[in-house]
Amino acid sequence: MDLPTVNSTTSISDNVDLKNYYEDLLFKNNSGKSLSDLPRKLNDNSNNSGSDTVDPLAGLNNLRNSIKSAGNGMENRRTFDDIDFMGRFPYLPPVPNQQQQPFSHQNGFIQEHPSSNLTSFQMSSSNSEPMSAPPISSNNNNLNSTQMGNYQAQQRSFPQFNGNSFHSNGNDLMGNRMDSDYMRLMNKTNIGFTSNSGSNFAAPSHSAGNPSSMNNQQVPSFNWQQPSHPESTIRRSSYISDTLINHQMPDARQKQTSQVQQQHAQGFNLFNSRFNYDNLNSTHLTAKGVPEFGNGVQPPYPYDNEPNNASISNSNNNNNSHNMVPMQQFRRNTQPVASFNPSLPTFQQQQQQPQQPQQPRNVNVPTSFNGERVDDVQLVQLQRSSSVPSSTNSHNLQNENSNEGNVSLDNGLVLIQGKHLTSSKTLHDLYSDCGSGYFASSAVFEFTDNIKKMLKLHDSNESYDAKNMGLIDEEGNTYQSLLNFLDILRSCNMNYVNDPESNNGIVSNNGGNKNRRKGSFTTELSCRNANNSFLPYTPLVLVALKNGKLELLSTPQATNLLLKRGDLVIIDGDRGRDLVLVVEPSVDLNLALFINFLKKKIHFDSLITSESQHYRNDEFIQMLIDSKNGQKKKLNPKLYDVVELTELIIPSKQVLRFATPWEVTTNLHNKFEDELKALHIAQSKLQALNDNSKSQNTNDSSSNNFTNAATYSKPKLNIKILNAEFQFDRKKLTFYYVCEERNDFRDLIKELFKYYKTRIWLCAIPNNLSIDSKYYDKQQKELKLYQNIVKNYNAEDLMNVNEFSQNRGNNRVNFAPPLNEIELDNFQIAVYEELVHELFH
């Protein structure tokens, strides 16, 4: 026979010749009969009998007889009489001199006639799966003499099927007979050995290798493959035969499986009139993922059933531990086939199971803790307890889990209700003791409180009534000018200020008759419309650096830090980390707008080197308003950016964590000592550059005939260095200075970089506020402190580079006074005080 032409687009269903070729040749056995003829002949025999119930044994005998007649000598093979080669399992002949027993299903259920009703599906295994070892008997599970005699007699008479070869009864080894004959015998006599009499004889195991006994506890075996309908009784189910012969896809069976499982869940039992349940009350230990079901039969549970039906029982684990059957690796099942299983066990039977089923996937169910069910509230408490550091003792952990009191941690912090971290009283006192002099906390707190007092009137729910106007008259015109300017700032930040659902910014106060001022801000997020461009304002944090320099920072969205005034925290620095003092833990919008304007004003003023280019501060506010309104009298755009001056941009730098006690004592003190030396070194370098420039100018003027020989020399650096500040991680060194003209700092920065090997930054102080003459020249506290220290040390020791590189070593000698005794020049916070005084006089 010539094969039809096959190409890449050819399919069995489209090409008739190719389909016939596969059906006629490839699916034929040695007798010349095709596998597809077997179900058809079985149906013909069933139709001819005229009975509603199909007997698979009768159909099998007829088919075997027909195969024998045309088998060309196949009847001479003894195995055809004893073995169903399609079903793989032999049908047992009746034992002589013994009363005929009703048909016994291999699962152990007595049945008068084989049932064709489809009840449920079970995953089948392949013949390549390992066989489990036979159970080891103990004193409590011995067979009696009659049972053992019947077992030996049937063992000798049963044919063996191992792999792909047949073995005779007389020439087989005992080990080969133990694998299959013993399991078939025990499956047939399963009821007699697993009754309620207390016998613990192990039930036979499935060919997949499931153990049938563990720790003297009975284990139900996997079901043998069962036919789903009469057509499949004479063959073993496979994917190819189901698809090509029966035209049934596996998905259809899986769908039918789910329907049967729903019937079981509703308590529907198809076998109450067919099976005897007297022996189905014993409890068995089942394999993980295969729950208990009756006596030796498991229902087709999916692996995502409801977990935690019962806790694990360990009452009998210590008895007869030597009888445990070795656990073999399970093979993943691939094909569902029908089985004659009774209904699902009741809820009480499921609660008695000693083994918990496998946890479901992607299902939110209550979990268990120490064998007890845990509700949602307890689960949250357990999750909170897992985040508590291990350094806490058990008493604190118990208080945290019960939401009673606070937990004091070893690092000085306090865990509040298992959620938030804050500084303890002891740690907060340490912060105040170490940071009061270095960060000028007293002056910073006083300045901030005064600003908040002036802005408090604007936050009032009342308009300018008699009471508030009296307060303005009492304090002078400062409040009035500041409040008017605050309205300008709020008008420039409408995305943060106005409520989109209000009329022109007028918001009612709890339904009362009193209204807020025009342009007032509400923090109620529920009043905002999500479809517009209005942004909710998140309160910022106001912090102070050395000498009281103010900074606005943001906090992470999911932060658990509860900050207080006076705390020392670690923040994001310039490509590093820095240590700052918390001034205001939560800054409202008015204070944020005002501080942001002051910082931008100081920044633009510091860039102006010539004092004649500055605008008068008492006229600056009005000129800013005119520039905003587009009038003729306006600010020079080359000197001031009006938009940057008035608009608030949320800072990207954030507060990271609280500072540790070591950081605020040892590390901060070492940082202060390095800053004292850096100030001295910078002034020495500056003096050396100026002296070199002066001597060079003198030599050039004497050697040349030009009247102005200084034009050929480098100009002298006309600056005054006030202070030095290291970033906390020592990745940046900033020098603050005051100058009256434009200078070239490249030589100075080059010399400083050679010494410190870090980034050097020179920051100017505005020269229109007379800060140096008012707050520095007369006192110079930091410079005098260093000069007193120099008297006790040699200049070579102070100028040694190796000393700076080892300044954080354990052998470092501290020469500066303690942090709680130092007094510095608070010129940074003085810049803000002088600017506010001149702007709003």
UniProtKB/Swiss-Prot annotation:
Low complexity: compositionally biased ranges: 305-323, 348-360, 385-394
Keywords from the named record: Cytoplasm, Mitochondrion, Phosphoprotein
Highest taxon above the source species: Eukaryota
Residues carrying Phosphoserine: S31, S34, S36, S237, S520
One GO cellular component, as annotated: mitochondrion
GO molecular function annotation: mRNA binding
Modified residues (Phosphothreonine): T334
PANTHER family: PROTEIN PSP1
Protein name: Protein PSP1
Gene behind the chain: PSP1
